[in-house]
Amino acid sequence: MGKYIGESVLRKEDPRLVTGEAKYLEDIQLSGMVHAVVKRSDYAHAKIKNIDTSEAEKVPGVIGVWTGKDFEDMNPMPCAWQAGGVDNNANTPRVLEIDKVTFTGQGVAVVVAEDRNIAEDASSKIVVDYEELPTVVSAEEAIKPGAPQLHENAPNNICMEWECGNQEGTELSLIHI
């Protein structure tokens, strides 16, 4: 085999990790640096009825608290490319969702503060009122008739159908296996 394939490789980073000499992102402190913490959804699929940031805004050291409505006029983030020139119905999520969350952990608000602990404390004070919606947890269930619709622009929860290569030739060659 090659130099690394199938062989144990000596890790070079272990000595500095076990001796406490490694530098982590938390160790970096720059002048004027601020910290952001994103408030994330506890639900896999839910309507956002209201977001109350008033208590978070009162925490000393908080620079600002924003929700998706503050960025409503900004373009959503593209999350897919046109595979092989095929049109797709891929959802383009926003940095912070405004009306509906479609996965657990989706960002709904952000707190910027003087340090990370303050930002985390303030984030915990944001109250989000959700209306939970039905969910599915597998692709097979998601495309069945009557399954909860995640994105309106992807009927039957199908973003796109794409084939490439020689399907007929591949199917014929499988007969001989």
Q: Which residues are covered by each model-predicted region?
A:
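Flexible, low-hydrophobicity surface segments
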Residues: M1-G169
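Conserved small/polar residues in nucleotide/adenosyl-binding loops
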Residues: S31, I175-I177
